[in-house]
Swiss-Prot record:
Keywords for the protein's UniProt record, in alphabetical order: Chloroplast, Plastid, Ribonucleoprotein, Ribosomal protein, RNA-binding, rRNA-binding
GO molecular function, one term: structural constituent of ribosome
Natural source organism: Gnetum parvifolium
Annotated GO biological process: translation
Any single Gene Ontology cellular-component annotation: chloroplast
Higher taxonomy: Eukaryota, Viridiplantae, Streptophyta, Embryophyta, Tracheophyta
Subunit text: Part of the 30S ribosomal subunit.
Name of the featured protein: Small ribosomal subunit protein uS8c
């Protein structure tokens, strides 16, 4: 399983069992992905944790008042089926209420940032 799919699956599974935190391997991709989720308000906090020689990222999840999840993630591009988009054709999620996370030549960013910089890239996932 690739890094992004592993991260998305970990977050989805944690929400299903109502966990407060998710622990994932500390990679640059996971860190940038988490930073975007934090900036957009989909998660509460990110912190680094060292267990022996391995580094992990711990994401603190956000819930609504009644314990409902606040985030839905849908993987778009996969290792066997890459999906790319030019900046004018980047889709909008729920009419702009959600975000698209892209992998571009300038790193991982949201659809809004990519449109502002006028660059396209690989569509990693939809978040709403």
């Amino acid at each position: 399983m690739d890094t992004i799919t592993n991260l998305i699956t970990s977050i989805k599974n944690a929400y299903m069992v109502k966990k407060q935190t998710v622990r994932v391997n500390a990679t640059r991709i996971n860190e940038n992905f988490g930073r975007i989720l934090l900036q957009e308000g989909f998660i509460r906090n990110i912190r680094e944790h060292k267990d022996g020689q391995k580094f992990f990222l711990i994401f603190t999840l956000k819930y609504r008042k009644r314990g409902e999840k606040i985030i839905t993630l849908k993987r778009i591009s996969r290792p066997g089926w890459r999906i790319y988009s030019d900046f004018p054709k980047i889709p909008k999620v729920l009419g702009g209420m959600g975000i698209v996370i892209l992998f571009t030549s300038q790193g991982i960013m949201t659809d809004r940032e990519a449109r502002k910089k006028k660059i396209g890239g690989e569509l990693l996932c939809f978040v709403w």
